[in-house]
A protein has these predicted regions:
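Mobile late-domain/C-terminal helix-loop "cap" segments
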Residues: 177-224
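A short structural micro-motif
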Residues: 65-68, 128, 186-190, 202, ...
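Short, amphipathic C-terminal "tail helix"
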Residues: 229-247
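Mg2+-dependent prenyl diphosphate-binding active-site environment of isoprenoid biosynthetic enzymes
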Residues: 1-178, 214-215, 240
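Alpha-solenoid HEAT/Armadillo repeat architecture
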Residues: 49, 171, 185, 225-228, ...
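Short, structured helix-loop boundary elements
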Residues: 59, 119-122, 193, 206, ...
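Solvent-exposed, charged/polar functional surfaces in cytosolic regulatory/catalytic domains
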Residues: 43, 219-226, 241
Length: 247
C-alpha cells in the first residue's frame, strides 16, 4: 500500500528521484508507473486474505485508508492554487500520511487479543506519528540538500505546494506572507528557496514548527504510556527513530 501511493505520488509531483533512485515514471513513463502502482495496490488484499482472523474487517479498512489517502492527496493538489491554514494543512497530513500509519497500528489490534482493547490508542498513536513524519519532511526539504533527502527538495516551491512552514507563515502574518510571495515570483527556484528559508528562520516559523513537533511527540509519549508495558520500549524506540530522522 505504501509503495503504491509513492509511485502515484511521484507521478503527480513529477519527481525524478525517490531515495536517490530514479522514479518509475521517469525511468519508463507515466503509463507504466500507473500500472506498477495499481499492481502494488492489488497485492495488499492478496496478503490480507492470508490473515486468519478479522480478515474482512482488515480488508475493509485497507480500502477505507486508500480513499482517505486519495482525499488527502486531493487536498494537496487543491492547495497548489490557494492558501491553506495550519488547520487545513494538518487535516491534509492526517489523511494523506497519518491514515496510513494509523492503519498499520490498528491492524495489530485486529490480529492479536493482546492489543484489541488498545485499538483506539494505537490508531491515535499511528495518526500522530504520520503527521510528525509529514511535518518533518517539510522542514527537512527546506533545511537540507537533495542528496541527503534522496529526492528533489525544491519541487514543493516550484508547484506551490503548501507545507507546515507556508501555512504557519500565512497564519502568522497574512499580509507579510502575501508580500513575500509576490516579491519572489520572478526569482529562480534556488533563489526562491533561499529567500523563503531566510524568512522562515527570521520570522520564527521554523521554531514554531519545531514546537508543534514537540507537542505531537509529547502526545505520542502520553499515548504510549497507556499501552501495555511490554511494548513501551519498542514504541518509544520507534518514536525516537521518527522524530530524530535526518532524511
Amino acid at each position: 500500500l505504501h509503495n503504491f501511493t509513492l509511485v502515484h505520488d511521484d507521478i503527480m509531483d513529477e519527481d525524478d528521484l525517490r531515495h536517490n533512485v530514479v522514479t518509475i515514471h521517469k525511468k519508463w513513463d507515466n503509463a507504466h508507473a500507473v500500472l506498477a502502482g495499481d499492481g502494488l495496490g492489488a497485492l495488499g488484499p492478496i496478503f490480507i486474505g492470508k490473515i486468519k482472523r478479522n480478515t474482512l474487517d482488515i480488508l475493509i479498512r485497507y480500502n477505507e485508508v486508500i480513499l482517505e489517502i486519495c482525499e488527502g492527496q486531493a487536498y494537496d493538489m487543491e492547495f497548489e492554487s490557494r492558501d491553506a491554514s495550519v488547520d487545513e494543512y494538518l487535516l491534509m497530513s492526517a489523511k494523506k500520511t497519518g491514515s496510513l500509519f494509523e492503519f498499520c497500528f490498528e491492524v495489530s489490534s485486529l490480529i492479536s487479543d493482546d492489543y484489541l482493547e488498545f485499538k483506539s490508542e494505537l490508531k491515535e498513536l499511528g495518526r500522530n506519528l504520520g503527521i510528525i513524519f509529514q511535518i518533518q519532511d517539510d522542514i527537512l526539504e527546506m533545511s537540507t540538500s537533495s542528496e541527503n533527502m534522496g529526492k528533489g527538495t525544491s519541487s514543493d516551491i516550484e508547484r506551490k505546494k503548501k507545507t507546515i512552514l507556508s501555512s504557519m507563515a500565512l497564519d502568522h502574518d497574512k499580509e507579510k506572507w502575501a508580500s513575500l510571495q509576490s516579491k519572489i515570483e520572478d526569482f529562480s527556484l534556488e533563489e526562491k528557496k533561499a529567500m523563503l528559508k531566510e524568512y522562515y528562520n527570521s520570522s520564527g516559523i521554523i521554531d514554531r514548527s519545531n514546537g508543534l513537533l514537540l507537542n505531537l511527540e509529547k502526545k505520542c509519549k502520553d499515548i504510549i504510556n497507556l499501552l501495555p508495558d511490554t511494548i513501551h520500549n519498542d514504541m518509544n524506540d520507534l518514536l525516537n527513530i521518527i522524530v530524530k530522522r535526518k532524511n
